[in-house]
């Protein structure tokens, strides 16, 4: 290093030679120190070359940069995958909303209420029960003022029982007023048909024997008179007038009395009429 003593001290950072470049470090007042290895004195300036030592910090920086690059790439991949998943979920939700059935009614749960299918079905059932209870309250008089399902049901039960008792009482009263219909088990329609048949039998019974009596009777002509009424309770009367003969047929509270006076032919006629009445009631 004795050959470089003639160089000025102002050059701190390096020296340019014909065949190489020499780095040196030092201050203005101190001796110059170099980081290059020692150069033998025999070596000439023309053939001398300085090999710089690379610091280990550069080697350490490379793997760190590679690690950070790999981490950044991994994070970017994860972010992309998460974005794809979120996009797929949003797309699937949109499809489900579009493909929802038309009859389905979306019920938005209130605060403190669940949204699962079981709770929704239970809520619908309770709403139906409340509607039926309102209808029953409207049917029962004075039941609108009652609160509580148990009390409402008690009022409804009592009202139905009272209606049942009234129906039974009315049916018993009707049966007591018309014992003929309920005693014999005859309906009102059947009873009206039966009365019409009886009237027809009366007309036939009166018309046929009257012609017979007119042929075999005395010169004094006999005639038949029949009084009928559907509304009044007056009895049916059959009178045959002629000479000293007199027959009468009367009805009093369902009992028929036959009074006969005269010849055997007239008695036979009266028996025929009575038999017809008896057959009609059997």
UniProtKB/Swiss-Prot annotation:
Its main location: nucleus. Residues 75-84 have a biased composition (Basic and acidic residues). Preferentially present in anthers and leaves lamina joints. Expressed in seedlings, leaves sheaths, collars and panicles. Residues 113-163 form the bHLH domain. GO terms for molecular function: DNA-binding transcription factor activity; protein dimerization activity. Keywords: Activator, Nucleus, Transcription, Transcription regulation. Belongs to the bHLH protein family. This is Transcription factor BC1.
């Amino acid at each position: 290093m004795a050959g470089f003593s003639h160089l000025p001290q102002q050059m701190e950072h390096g020296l340019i030679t014909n065949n190489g470049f020499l780095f040196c470090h030092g201050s203005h007042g101190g001796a110059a120190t170099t980081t290059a290895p020692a150069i033998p004195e025999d070596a000439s300036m023309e053939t001398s070359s300085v090999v710089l030592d690379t610091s280990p910090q550069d080697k350490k920086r490379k793997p760190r940069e590679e690690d950070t690059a790999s981490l950044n790439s991994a994070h970017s991949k994860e972010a992309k995958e998460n974005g794809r998943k979120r996009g797929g979920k949003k797309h699937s939700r949109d499809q489900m909303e579009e493909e929802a059935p038309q009859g389905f009614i979306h019920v938005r749960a209130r605060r403190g209420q669940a949204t699962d299918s079981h709770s929704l079905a239970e809520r619908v059932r309770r709403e139906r029960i409340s509607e039926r209870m309102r209808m029953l309250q409207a049917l029962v008089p004075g039941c609108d003022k009652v609160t509580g399902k148990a009390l409402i049901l008690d009022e409804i039960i009592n009202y139905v029982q009272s209606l049942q008792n009234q129906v039974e009482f009315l049916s018993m009263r009707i049966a007591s007023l018309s014992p003929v219909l309920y005693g014999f088990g005859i309906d009102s329609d059947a009873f009206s048909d039966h009365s019409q048949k009886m009237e027809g039998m009366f007309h036939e019974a009166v018309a046929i024997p009257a012609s017979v009596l007119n042929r075999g009777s005395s010169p004094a002509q006999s005639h038949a008179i029949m009084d009928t009424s559907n509304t009044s309770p007056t009895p049916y009367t059959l009178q045959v007038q002629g000479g000293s003969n007199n027959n009468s047929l009367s009805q009093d509270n369902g009992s028929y009395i036959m009074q006969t006076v005269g010849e055997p032919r007239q008695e036979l006629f009266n028996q025929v009429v009575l038999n017809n009445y008896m057959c009609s009631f059997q």
